[in-house]
A protein has these predicted regions:
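Generic hydrophobic, helix-prone segments enriched in Leu/Val/Ile
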Residues: 3, 61-65, 121, 128
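Zymogen propeptides
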Residues: 17-112
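Hydrophobic h-region of N-terminal signal peptides that target proteins for export
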Residues: 10-18
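Sec-dependent signal peptide recognition
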Residues: 2-10
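Active-site beta-strand/loop microenvironment that shapes enzyme catalytic pockets
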Residues: 74, 104-221
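A broad, structure-centric signal for solvent-exposed, well-ordered loop/edge residues
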Residues: 8, 86, 101, 160-161
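Short, intrinsically disordered/low-complexity patches at protein termini
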Residues: 3, 14, 209-210
Length: 221
């Protein structure tokens, strides 16, 4: 599976009054190190990007930054935020600027995406949300931006039931949690961690009732 990119843009940096370096900070928790980025949508614009201006897959954070510079936009923060198939198409829900290019995927299958419950991260105006897929269906949202990934890390304050404290799969991981209706928190581990420890960070240290896994070995920030 390939990755696509989720981006925070400063469309009017001076009037927003938030410097790019203020978005993210290091955090240590239970012998692991993380980079944590808090994004308040009342102050910062959050968007999803897949293709460049010519309709070609971006493929890298460098290509993304270059594409945005060509449009006169400044990149404040970027993180890969989902999974693609070999044809570079998202395997789950993908909405960009209100246009749904891929419908919600509720099928069973193999791989992290299909470890249910998986979930959806979405943006609507200055609101942000993280919800398990079946819960998202009931919300009947019409988001501006959305990406489906999996598995969920934390569901309504509980760590995903399939995670084990003694899990032996250790990788660099990244994901997103919801702090409140306007604030998302994005995290990437600086060292390899298992799913349980990553989920515990969101639940216990960052106090996120819902959090979603984005990517493993190829995580980038």
């Amino acid at each position: 599976m390939r990755r696509f990119f989720q981006v925070v843009l400063f469309l009017c940096l001076q009037s927003i009054g938030v410097a790019a370096e203020q978005l993210c900070a290091p955090l240590s928790y239970e012998d692991s190190s993380y980079s944590v980025c808090r994004i308040d949508l009342r102050e910062t614009r959050l968007e999803l990007f897949n293709l460049d201006g010519q309709g070609a897959p971006l493929g890298s954070l460098g290509a993304l930054a270059e594409s945005l510079r060509a449009e006169g936009k400044e990149l404040g923060f970027a993180m890969n935020a989902g999974m693609f198939d070999e044809a570079l198409k998202p395997i789950g829900l993908y909405v960009e600027d209100g246009n749904e290019s891929k419908k919600l995927n509720r099928r069973d299958g193999y791989g992290n995406f299909h470890v249910k419950p998986n979930g959806v991260f979405y943006v609507k105006g200055d609101r942000v949300g993280v919800a398990a897929t079946e819960a998202y269906v009931k919300l009947n949202e019409k988001p501006d931006f959305a990406t489906q990934s999996g598995p969920m890390l934390v569901i309504d304050g509980k760590i995903h039931p399939k995670f084990s404290e003694t899990g032996m799969s250790y990788k660099i991981r990244n994901g997103v949690g919801m702090l409140d209706a306007h604030t998302a928190i994005f995290v990437i581990s600086e060292n390899a961690v298992n799913f349980y420890d990553f989920a515990k960070l969101f639940r216990d240290r960052l106090t996120c009732a819902n959090a979603l896994f984005f990517d493993g070995t190829v995580s980038s920030l």
